[in-house]
Amino acid sequence: MSDPVFIAPKGGLTLGSVAEACGVPLPDGADPAQPVTGAAPLETAGPSELAYMDNARYGDALATTRALACLVSPRFAPRVPAGTIALVTRDPYRAYAGLLARLYEEAMRPGSLFAAAGVSPGAHVHPQARLEDGMRIDPGAVVGPGAEIGSGTVLGPNAVIGPNVRIGRDCSIGAGATLTHALVGNRVIVHPGARIGQDGFGFAMGAGGHIKVPQVGRVIIQDDVEIGANTTIDRGASRDTVVGEGTKIDNLVQIAHNVVIGRHCVIVSGVGISGSTTLEDYVVLGGQVGVVGHLRIGMGSQIAGSSNVNRDVPPGSRWGGTPAKPVRTWFREMTTLARLAERGGKDEAEG
């Protein structure tokens, strides 16, 4: 549940303003002036709070909810109880996300741990760093020579910004994160502990020992990217590692040198992407997916969790398994194996 001690909802919202923001019409008889004080799950929502429902599993919770209003798809609208206003939309979850963004604006981007604006006396900023007005740097943060940081950006405690790194406006760099050899766009969120721009894993291997290959590329992070806690993004060997506009990367992801990730991709926790692989726009990688190097995953493709991708994936594909293959083929193989295993067990019992 939300706790105002940590994140307080925005005041002054009404049912009418919320419905307008979500692009949902109010039904006849609903009072647009009714105050909205928060959002909560169906089971706990109170008479001044909003909820949403888009899964038949929660039908019982919908039937007993006390919420002021509920965002629902046309399919579930008839099941909304009489005491709750049905706000009908084709995508309840997306509308609910818009509602939460209005109610809890401060949760949209991690802020400074300290109320004071400007540079904390406990931070270490090199005299040759260039800082725009209106930013915040928390105690323990380090900013190297030649670094540029835009207005509205927040550096958390003990964040380290290396020499000549450029960070755009309205970004959030979490506590203990490190950025070197990187160019970062606007409205980028880097969560605590992330490591961006360190050496890629490059060695010329041989019987006489392994020779380190200098990694002289950069990391380019475009606008509106979000990078999860303890994720690591290596800089390029000779070309750049790139993360495209609007891409969202979960916690504990490893992105190797020279990887190019397109726009609006989604990469879930535990993924590892080997060097020089390209993800085109709108690719989704489920949790713990492994991708070998020098591949191309086509635009709009989706890879099921725990899969291992060892060859190129055509655009618009849905693949899964180890090694990954089209989902229909994978399911058919799994079904066949299950039947063979069951038949083998019966044969052993009869024998």
From Swiss-Prot:
Q: Quote the EC number.
A: 2.3.1.191
Keywords of the record: Acyltransferase, Lipid A biosynthesis, Lipid biosynthesis, Lipid metabolism, Repeat, Transferase
**Where does the record place a coiled coil?**
none
Part of which pathway?
Answer: Bacterial outer membrane biogenesis; LPS lipid A biosynthesis
What catalytic activity does the UniProt entry give for this protein? a UDP-3-O-[(3R)-3-hydroxyacyl]-alpha-D-glucosamine + a (3R)-hydroxyacyl-[ACP] = a UDP-2-N,3-O-bis[(3R)-3-hydroxyacyl]-alpha-D-glucosamine + holo-[ACP] + H(+)
InterPro entries from the xrefs? Hexapep, Hexapep_transf_CS, LpxD, Trimer_LpxA-like_sf, UDP_GlcNAc_AcTrfase_non-rep
List the record's Gene Ontology CC terms alphabetically.
membrane
Which PROSITE patterns does the protein's record reference? HEXAPEP_TRANSFERASES
Which residues are catalytic? Answer: H257 (proton acceptor)
Top-level taxon: Bacteria
State a single Gene Ontology molecular function: N-acyltransferase activity
Q: What processes does the entry annotate via GO biological process terms?
A: lipid A biosynthetic process
What cystine pairs are annotated? none
Function comment: Catalyzes the N-acylation of UDP-3-O-acylglucosamine using 3-hydroxyacyl-ACP as the acyl donor. Is involved in the biosynthesis of lipid A, a phosphorylated glycolipid that anchors the lipopolysaccharide to the outer membrane of the cell.
HAMAP family hit by this protein:
LpxD (MF_00523)
Q: Which family does it belong to?
A: Belongs to the transferase hexapeptide repeat family. LpxD subfamily.
Self-association and partners:
Homotrimer.
The protein's name: UDP-3-O-acylglucosamine N-acyltransferase
